[in-house]
Amino acid sequence: MSLRYYIKNILFGLYCTLIYIYLITKNSEEYYFLVTDKMLYAIVISTILCPYSKYAIEHIAFNFIKKHFFERRKNLNNAPVAKLNLFMLYNLLCLVLAIPFGLLGLFISIKNN
C-alpha cells in the first residue's frame, strides 16, 4: 500500500471522527453520545486503521471477483444513485470494521512488501 492510497482513504475516517468530536463539543440535551475516553480511543484507532481495512476488504474481494465480471456487466454505471448509496455503505462498513480488518490489511501490506 502506498502513502497516496493511505492519505486518499483516511479522509472518510477523519471526516467521521471530526463529526463525532464536533457533536460531543456541541452536545445539547437532545442528543445522547457515548462520551468516554475508551470510545474516543476506539474512534481514533478506527480512523488510523480505516485505510488498512479498505485495503484488506479490496484484497479479499478481488481474489473472488475476476476481471471478466466487470467486462460482462457493462450497465453497472446506469444507476448512479444506487451506486453512490452502495459506495457510502461500503465506506461505513470499512470504518466500522476498521480494527479487525485494519489489522488484517496491515498484515497483508507487510507481507506483500
UniProtKB/Swiss-Prot annotation:
Pfam family, one: Microcin
Classification via InterPro entries: Microcin
Keyword Cell division recorded: no
Origin superkingdom: Bacteria
Signal peptide: none
Keywords: Bacteriocin immunity, Plasmid
UniProt GO MF annotations: toxic substance binding
BP-aspect Gene Ontology terms: bacteriocin immunity
Biological function: This protein is able to protect a cell, which harbors the plasmid ColE1 encoding colicin E1, against colicin E1.
Name the record gives this protein: Colicin-E1 immunity protein
Native source species: Escherichia coli
